[in-house]
């Protein structure tokens, strides 16, 4: 039996019956929350957040962390709604670790704890550990890469206007003797090929700004905020995620995202839409031992059609669209009420943790 099945069997046949003997009958959402917490093993990541015996003893950070996961599972728009529900639901309150209503911390305490989790990248660490443990040992057929807009209530960063530098237009043809031609700056994609994951991620802009995309009807739409780049595998399981400024083109995060995914799982095919049609991305995918299947971008001339076999495989890319919509519709992706890239990423990661656990267990159905 697989470790994943052992965990599922223990939850279904041991943990649920015991909890229902101690609590009221569990709802479907409460059962989902329990499965997410058990698979994510969030308690293993709490050492940096425990009280060290200095100063006033603070509220239990593990209970607050589990409450934030519940916020994603229940798709609550605000922390205030979460706290109100914890006061009303004896089951969920006790599942998080608070026996009485008086033990539930204030909204400001929740906010301070969330800031601590964000500074430490706790959501990313929990998700990475869960993916490596439960998806890493298995061979993944397809990695579907995509980006989705993240709309926030934050003032966008605006660059200081600079006076345009007018360069004298040089004549076509060979340069004259002694003429010095300024070298072109290397493109980010070219630089990424020779750098590691940490350096590539650090190079991506993460300030809140304005992004623009063309929707399914061909109209341009804009939003203020960020862009979430996600790699997902068959079964609608998110494997890796990066947050960038909204204005960053999808292709600029492809290589660092591929590096992150390659550290976590072994896969065969990389599926991407025409936004990722760049020779650097194709070559890096092949360098990883993958087969890149990328919809061509008709920049010049007519659009090249895929061969029939690749076209069939490319249909699996709908995985990315389902993960994006699942995050936004069911796990808090539309209710980003925090500011700053670190906090926004933590909020979204709690949703991705819930999706990952839920979809992994669905593989057993």
Q: What residue ranges belong to the model's regions?
A:
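Structural motif
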Residues: 53-62, 220-221, 338-348
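Short, positively charged, Gly/Tyr-enriched micro-motifs
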Residues: 57-125
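Polybasic low-complexity intrinsically disordered regions
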Residues: 107-288, 297
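Helix-centered, glycine/charged polyanion-binding patches within enzymatic domains
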Residues: 274-342
């Amino acid at each position: 039996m697989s470790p994943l099945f052992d965990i599922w069997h223990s939850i279904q046949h041991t943990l649920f019956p015991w909890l229902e003997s101690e609590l009221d009958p569990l709802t479907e959402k409460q059962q989902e929350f329990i499965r997410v917490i058990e698979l994510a093993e969030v308690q293993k990541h709490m050492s940096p957040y425990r009280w060290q015996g200095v100063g006033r003893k603070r509220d239990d950070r593990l209970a607050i962390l589990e409450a934030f996961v519940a916020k994603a599972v229940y798709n609550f728009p605000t922390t205030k709604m979460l706290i109100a529900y914890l006061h009303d639901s004896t089951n969920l309150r006790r599942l998080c670790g608070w026996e009485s209503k008086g033990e539930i911390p204030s909204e400001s305490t929740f906010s301070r704890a969330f800031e601590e989790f964000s500074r430490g990248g706790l959501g990313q660490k929990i998700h990475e550990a869960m993916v490596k443990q439960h998806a890493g040992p298995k061979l993944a057929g397809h990695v579907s890469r995509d980006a989705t807009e993240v709309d926030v209530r934050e003032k966008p960063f605006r660059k200081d206007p600079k006076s345009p530098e007018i360069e004298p237009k040089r004549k076509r043809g060979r340069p004259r003797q002694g003429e010095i031609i300024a070298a072109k700056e290397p493109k980010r994609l070219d630089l990424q090929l020779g750098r590691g994951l940490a350096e590539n991620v650090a190079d991506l802009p993460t300030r809140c700004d304005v992004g623009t995309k063309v929707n399914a009807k061909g109209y341009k739409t804009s939003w203020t905020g960020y862009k979430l780049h996600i790699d997902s595998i068959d079964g609608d399981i998110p494997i890796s995620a990066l947050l960038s400024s909204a204005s960053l083109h999808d292709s600029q995060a492809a290589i660092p995202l591929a590096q992150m995914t390659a550290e976590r799982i072994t896969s065969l095919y990389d599926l991407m839409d025409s936004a990722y049609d760049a020779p650097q991305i194709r070559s890096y995918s092949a360098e990883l031992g993958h087969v890149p299947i990328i919809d061509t971008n008709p920049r010049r001339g007519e659009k090249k059609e895929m061969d029939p076999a690749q076209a069939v495989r490319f249909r699996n890319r709908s995985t990315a669209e389902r993960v994006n919509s699942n995050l936004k519709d069911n796990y808090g992706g539309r209710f980003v009420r925090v500011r700053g890239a670190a906090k926004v990423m933590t909020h979204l990661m709690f949703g991705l943790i819930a999706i990952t656990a839920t979809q992994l267990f669905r593989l057993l159905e």
